A protein has these predicted regions:
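Conserved flavin/dinucleotide-binding core of flavoenzymes
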Residues: 11, 27-29, 33-158
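Central helical "cap/lid" subdomain
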Residues: 1-27
Length: 158
């Protein structure tokens, strides 16, 4: 079974900022269709927020802004569209990007993910080889996919 031809890896980018104003104090996690994609507050008391969590196409767009030196402007414009009534600082006092070229793995269209996920847990009948993690799970790119997969593999081992 050629599982590797049925998955594709995508880049992942998380952008963290600290704002003095804490303008986001009344919001929880926000999911958008804008450039920033996901907005996840981390510590309201110090103004820390994951202002952008992107993968794939959105990640590549954001990386282009980073390369061109326009990331902060692009983020600010996205935020003003999402939160038009909030007073958002144009420049946070802190910014950090975390990039992974192979950040997430996804099943390709047409892949029998259930069958392949089960197969990958123990891909060899003649060797004690076990594979677990989110990459070949039914819930890829999320910790709970890895945890579920690890539990299923542990049942095979015991």
């Amino acid at each position: 079974l050629d599982v590797m031809s049925h998955v594709t890896s995508q880049p992942l980018l998380r952008t963290y900022v600290i704002y003095d104003s804490k303008w986001f104090k009344n919001y929880g996690k926000v999911v958008t269709d804008s450039l920033v994609k996901y907005i996840i507050p981390i510590d309201y008391s110090i103004g820390l927020i994951m202002i952008s969590y992107t993968d794939g196409e959105y990640c590549r767009k954001m990386m282009k802004h980073i390369e061109e030196g326009t990331q902060l402007e692009a983020i600010y414009e996205s935020l003003k569209e999402i939160f038009p009534d909030d007073k958002i600082e144009k420049r946070p006092k802190y910014l950090r990007n975390e990039y992974w070229e192979t950040g997430a793995v996804y099943w390709n269209r047409g892949a029998d993910s259930e069958k392949m996920s089960k197969f990958m847990m123990k891909p060899s009948k003649s060797h004690n080889l076990f594979i677990c993690g989110d990459s070949f799970s039914e819930n890829q790119a999320w910790t709970d996919g890895a945890i579920y997969n690890a539990r299923e593999v542990s049942k095979l081992i015991n």
